[in-house]
Swiss-Prot record:
Its main location: endoplasmic reticulum. It holds the Pfam family FA_desaturase. This is Delta-9 desaturase-like 4 protein. The chain crosses the membrane at residues 39-59, 61-81, 175-195, 200-220. The histidine box domains may contain the active site and/or be involved in metal ion binding. The keyword 4Fe-4S does not apply. A motif (Histidine box-1) lies at residues 78-83. GO terms for cellular component: endoplasmic reticulum membrane. The keyword Transmembrane applies. GO terms for molecular function: oxidoreductase activity, acting on paired donors, with oxidation of a pair of donors resulting in the reduction of molecular oxygen to two molecules of water. Pathway: Lipid metabolism; polyunsaturated fatty acid biosynthesis. A motif (Histidine box-2) lies at residues 115-119.
Length: 300
């Protein structure tokens, strides 16, 4: 088999051939894919049970869970760890990364590796969640085919910076323990209402909000920048995604800590980063220069 990390023509043709012939549900499913699919199915099942176990208190908890875990994903996994768009002390970096684990989107190494591959191979045959393979694939199905991702992108050698840190190695080994403990405590505290209206609804919203950035934000919306991909700005998702849906902005200036580049573009994650910068906690906060903006601007 050819090395999937190479960019020569033979590698690319093999990937395209595999895409055309791949039978999604008839393939062999390794344990990691079965676990991932099971978790997603359970979350959706709990969400369906929510109306039968409804409590306002539990629903409020679910909305808070969604907001905190989604903000943790965008602040920590995405802008801090994936793109290094700002620096914060480890005493702040690690708690935010730990909080993001409870969004049930994987450990930091896994999430960051996938996202870095997405930017390296955006919209190509080797993009982990390429829109070229369909809306459903880019939205959710890619999550359950780790062997396909490995074949397209190669190993996780793009997160060596995280592999060197004990905390992220520890989280990778023990993530299941932390998640099971959290859901056990949730049930012991609030019973089925907190499992369904709380955890189920909260994680369900967080899932689809995140996945819409991968799918919808490469199909619908407006473009402000001349990027060599299909990224779009989707304004109506900006509040729910904590600013991540200004996706054309993001692909134009990947290392920018701010994605809502206009004053009217809601970007809650940026507001948090800016707060830490004002307090002197966040440093080396990266923003696009006016010259960079001029070079990337679409000719109107």
């Amino acid at each position: 088999m050819c090395d999937p990390t190479r960019d020569d023509g033979s590698s690319r043709s093999r990937v395209v051939s595999t895409m055309q012939k791949r039978a999604y549900f008839q393939r062999q499913w390794p344990l990691v894919d079965v676990v991932r699919a099971s978790v997603v199915v359970i979350v959706h099942f709990l969400c369906l049970l929510a109306p039968f176990n409804f409590k306002w208190e539990a629903l409020r908890f679910g909305l808070v869970l969604f907001a905190l875990t989604t903000l943790s994903i965008t602040f920590s996994f995405h802008r801090n760890l994936s793109h290094r768009s700002f620096k914060i002390p480890k005493w702040l970096e690690y708690p935010w990364a730990y909080s993001a684990v409870f969004a049930l989107q994987g450990d930091p190494m896994d999430w960051v590796s996938i996202h870095r591959f997405h930017h390296q191979f955006t919209d190509s045959d080797r993009d982990p969640h390429s829109p070229k393979e369909g809306l459903l694939f880019s939205h959710i199905l890619w999550i359950f085919d780790t062997q396909y991702i490995k074949y397209k992108c190669g190993g996780r050698d793009n997160v060596l910076d995280l592999k060197k840190q004990w905390f992220y190695k520890f989280l990778r080994r023990t993530i299941a323990v932390h998640i099971l403990m959290f859901w056990t405590i949730l049930y012991l505290y609030g019973g089925l209402p907190y499992l369904t209206c709380g955890g189920g609804v909260g994680i369900f919203i967080g899932y689809h909000v995140t996945w819409l950035v991968n799918s919808a934000c490469h199909i619908w919306g407006s473009r402000s920048w001349n990027t060599k991909d299909t990224s779009r700005n989707v304004w109506w998702l900006s509040l729910f995604t904590m600013g991540e849906s200004w996706h054309n902005n993001h692909h134009a200036f990947e290392s920018s800590a701010r994605q809502g580049l206009e004053w009217w573009q809601i970007d809650i994650t940026w507001y948090l980063i800016r707060l830490f910068e004002v307090l002197g906690i966040a440093t080396d906060v990266k923003l696009p220069s006016e010259l960079q903006k001029q070079k990337m601007a679409l000719v109107r």
